[in-house]
From Swiss-Prot:
CDD domains: M1_LTA4H (cd09599). Binds 1 zinc ion per subunit. The keyword Hydrolase applies. GO terms for cellular component: cytosol; fungal-type vacuole lumen; multivesicular body; nucleus; NVT complex. It comes from Phaeosphaeria nodorum (strain SN15 / ATCC MYA-4574 / FGSC 10173) (Glume blotch fungus). This is Leucine aminopeptidase 2.
Length: 623
């Protein structure tokens, strides 16, 4: 019997025997019962001649019936295996010949334990009129929405039919809204069936759905923005004219051209746990990027880059997550270089290095999760989520740019994406592709032959730190040095802080300045923290990137005037980038307030964020 060796340790499915080629989802979105209910049809191809069982991933699902080629089939749901859910085993009437397909229809409903869906009451939305729901399936949460081969090593095309009383978005191209049904009871709304097609094969974690009181506006020739009606104008003003230059910039670096037809942005409610999620056709984005000054929209450059790295060429397992995020961070910074100049690219990398330092220090420099390629057997991929695959992954690629020279490296980039488009790969595929591409280039071939690949993939801790262009950070560090001298030599310092110190800066320069300040923040008095925030307007800023870092410095300094504003910020944003570090700092400053703040806001957070913060605050005792 021939089998493929499964590369993904975080799936219970037997995807090496059967592989999904097309997924059809037909669900009703029931806001009242907070569930999706309907059916899923999987068209699966046999990779062997002998296997009679199909095993799918499932997690907290209510599966009531299964048909195989329209005939009722026996199935069983195994014991739950944390953190992967329960294997769903379907008995086929007979083994399917290799290369032939079988159609499996499952009648299914989600349950209250679903980890991918967040359901929001009207009170949790901006206009407080209608409920709202959205999904977040990365890393392995699609299995809590529908039984599937929940592994990035499998890609299928998708069809969506989603019935809802409110507008729906899904990770495909919209094909219409029809089949109106009147309300089933007084006071309820009638429903429409919204349909979408995704002709490009995608991984299960890119399955996305959102429904709520949504409106849209154009922001470019290939792009629209969607948000709540009240925020729409503000979102449009922030993003209008910004997307197409990003797209033109990246299309000058990679190949093939943009494959997904439209690039739209959904600005989610503030509880969304990530900066963005690269769902095809619709990037999901945090409202924290809408700062009124167009200073935080680099998140869009990042998610757009995922249209190539992650979505078109996908890491085959979460152990090789750097292939998604390292490439994407690299491409995001290349976009910045094209649009704003190389000094901006280097400036972003300097900010990234600080994030890398924080993650490595938190884990410890010899921790397995600080490696580029990690071992996730028996582990939860969410536990390994940090800036390391982003930033250490970026440095892996930047290392090759420096090693081979930018011109040669730039010839490889489009070749890589053309070679692996529509496929899932691991780090060894990347290595083989790079070596093969330069096989006839004597100089490059010699450098790659001498390169320490084992160190790149498996060494924990820091990558080599390159020399960055310091142009944009010099003034940030200089001002931080003045503050440090003021703090330690108050009487002899002639430095008088003034708003003009930062008047000419872009907001990310304030970010770098505040991150430098954090390195000695515990030496600040409460009065000096007040002076810092008041003088530079950091205590009143609408820019969450800046505000969160100022408040973090205040928490490090144990300055009580920053405690309540920190708690308030934690009650209005669910992005884990801000929430998790701030809870850790607030706990050290005032554990009682940290716990009270979490208990007050835990239902506001997405289940993934809530689970992570619980681990941060309580360890595993809450399980």
């Amino acid at each position: 019997m021939e089998t493929r060796t499964p590369r993904d340790p975080n799936t219970l499915s037997n995807y090496h025997n059967y592989v999904t080629r097309h997924t059809s989802l037909d669900f009703e979105i029931e806001f009242e019962r907070k569930r999706l209910v309907g059916s899923v049809v999987l068209r699966m191809e046999s990779l062997t001649d002998a296997e009679v069982d199909v095993v799918l991933d499932s997690s907290f699902l209510d599966v009531s019936a299964i048909k195989v080629d329209r005939q009722s089939a026996e199935f069983s749901i195994g014991e739950r295996i944390e953190p992967y859910g329960s294997p769903l085993t379907i008995k086929l009437p007979a083994a399917v010949p290799k290369g032939k397909t079988v159609e499996i229809e499952l009648t299914v409903a989600t349950t209250e334990k679903c980890t991918a869906l967040q359901w929001m009451e009207p009170a949790q939305t901006s206009n407080k009129k209608h409920p709202y729901m959205f999904s977040q399936c990365q890393a392995n949460h699609a299995r809590s929405v529908f039984p599937c081969q929940d592994t990035p090593d499998v890609k299928s095309t998708f069809s969506f039919a989603l019935r809802s009383p409110l507008p729906v978005l899904a990770s495909g191209l919209p094909t219409g809204a029809s089949k109106y049904q009147p309300a089933k009871k007084d006071g309820a709304s009638g429903t429409l069936k919204y349909t979408f097609e995704q002709p490009v094969a995608i991984t299960s974690y890119l399955m996305a759905v959102a429904s709520g009181d949504l409106a849209c506006a154009s922001i470019g020739p290939r792009s629209t923005v969607w948000s709540g009606p009240e925020e729409l104008l503000e979102c449009q003003q922030e993003l209008e004219g910004e997307i197409e230059p990003f797209m033109k910039a990246i299309e000058s670096i990679v190949k093939p051209t943009y494959q997904w037809t439209q690039y739209n942005v959904l600005i989610l409610p503030p509880s969304f746990p990530y900066g963005g999620m690269e769902n095809p056709v619709w990037t999901y984005a945090t409202p924290s990027i809408i700062s009124g000054d167009k200073q935080n929209i680099d998140v869009i450059a990042h998610e757009l880059s995922h249209s190539w790295s992650g979505n078109l060429v996908s890491a085959a397992s979460w152990e090789h997550f750097w292939l998604n995020e390292g490439w994407t961070t690299y491409l995001e910074r290349r976009i910045q270089g094209v649009l704003h100049g190389e000094s901006h690219r280097h400036f972003s990398a300097i900010i990234g290095w600080k994030a890398l330092e924080e993650s490595i220090e938190r884990y410890g420099a010899d921790h397995d999760f600080t490696k580029l390629v990690i071992d996730l057997k028996g582990k939860d991929p969410d536990d390994a989520f940090s800036s390391i695959p982003y930033e250490k992954g970026f440095h892996a690629l930047y290392q090759f740019e420096l090693l081979l020279g930018k011109d040669k490296w730039d010839n490889f980039i489009p070749h890589y994406f053309e070679t692996f488009k529509f496929k899932s790969i691991d780090s060894y595929d990347f290595k083989a592709c790079l070596i093969d591409f330069f096989a006839k280039d004597t100089e490059a071939n010699k450098k790659l032959a001498e390169f320490d690949w084992d160190k790149l993939f498996y060494a924990p801790g820091y990558p080599p730190k390159p020399d960055f262009d310091q142009t944009m950070v010099k003034s940030c560090y200089k001002l931080a040095d003045k503050w440090q001298y003021l703090i330690t030599n108050n009487s002899s310092s002639d430095f008088k802080p003034h708003h003009s110190d930062v008047a000419d800066w872009v907001s990310n320069q304030s970010v770098v300045f505040l991150e430098k300040v954090q390195s000695f923040a515990e030496k600040f008095s409460a009065e000096q923290i007040h002076l810092l925030g008041h003088t530079y307007g950091y205590d009143k800023t609408q820019n969450i990137e800046v505000l969160s870092r100022y408040l973090s410095a205040g928490l490090m300094a144990k300055a009580p005037e920053t405690y309540q504003p920190s708690a308030e910020l934690l009650g209005r944003i669910g992005r884990m980038k801000f929430v998790r570090p701030m809870y850790r700092l607030l706990e050290k400053a005032d554990r009682k307030l940290a716990v009270e703040t979490f208990e007050k806001n835990k239902d506001f957070y997405h289940p993934i964020c809530r689970s992570m913060v619980e681990k941060d605050l309580f360890g595993d005792e809450k399980k």
